[in-house]
Amino acid sequence: MKNKKSRARSILTFAVKVMATVFIFLLLFGFAEVNNVLHPPRIIPEGKTLRKFDIEYHDVDLLTTDGIRLSAWYTPPHNGAVILLAHGYGDKRPEWVYEMLARKGYGVLAWDARAHGASDGEISTIGYLEVLDVKAALDYALAQPNVEHVGAWGGSMGASTLILAAAQFPQIEALFVDSPFTSLNDELDFLIPYPVINPLAKFLAEIETGIRIHEISPVDEIARISPRPVYIVQGLADTVAPPDSGEKLFNAAREPRTLWAEENVPHQQMYLDNPRRYKRRLLAFFDEWLLGNYGTHGDFRQNG
């Protein structure tokens, strides 16, 4: 009997040790993964595309209300309208968008998000504190001469951030967003579909940032943008964000709203798949809503 009890106790002790070891491993693994997410790779922008097309731009510094210096480029407008450009997670200033807008007379302001590129900042909050980055850019643009209207383009994380920002700041008059996510909670559920690791990752992220995951929810804020227009671009072969994100955001938004979704297009690849159509729709959208020039580049709502 004693041997049986001793054996049972040994088995129980071993099981507890194994469980403790697994828990510690998951905890350490989770901390490492969360730390990697909060510290994205830095890609320093070079401006090669802008120089190739002889686009005038100035290096400027923006300062957020929480004291973060952001490195940016600014091109003054020839038509009275400036477009803010917010890039995605781990990405850089989108020179391809900058070029197509600047060559059509738009002013452009593009910056490295906090903890990205040449900007200061220790961690990325994937949309939460990045709203302060947008506010710093918006304030800078509105303070420049010959600026009468401000619109915004965003990709991926930048798209989601701009939805949150535009819901707060009515000075953003028109919003074009490419591959946004509906909420950070949905995004993490999509990228980490594992019963134990998923809640652990969310818990650790909240500890590291002091931010509630559920507070980063563009789908709950997008309706506040109306009556200003929002244009949503969604590739239905997205593997970075849920491919139904665009439809959910469109359904949550109010008029005026537009959804452009295409089969077999990955995350933020619509331009590569349809470059002429993308450019035409982007310019037509801002021409109509910021300049009042309907049909200059065709109807942004139509195929073709």
What are these regions (language model features)?
Residues 11-63:
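An N-terminal hydrophobic leader/cap segment in hydrolases
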Residues 239-245:
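Conserved alpha/beta-hydrolase "acid-adjacent" motif
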Residues 274-304:
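Catalytic active-site module of serine/aspartate enzymes centered on a nucleophile-bearing elbow/loop
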Residues 225-226, 231-234, 238:
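Short beta-strand/loop motif that positions the catalytic acidic residue
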Residues 145-156:
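Alpha/beta-hydrolase fold nucleophile elbow
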Residues 65, 70-140:
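Membrane-embedded segments
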Residues 265-276:
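Catalytic histidine-centered segment of alpha/beta-hydrolase-like enzymes
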Residues 164-214, 220-223, 261:
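Hydrolase active-site cap/lid region
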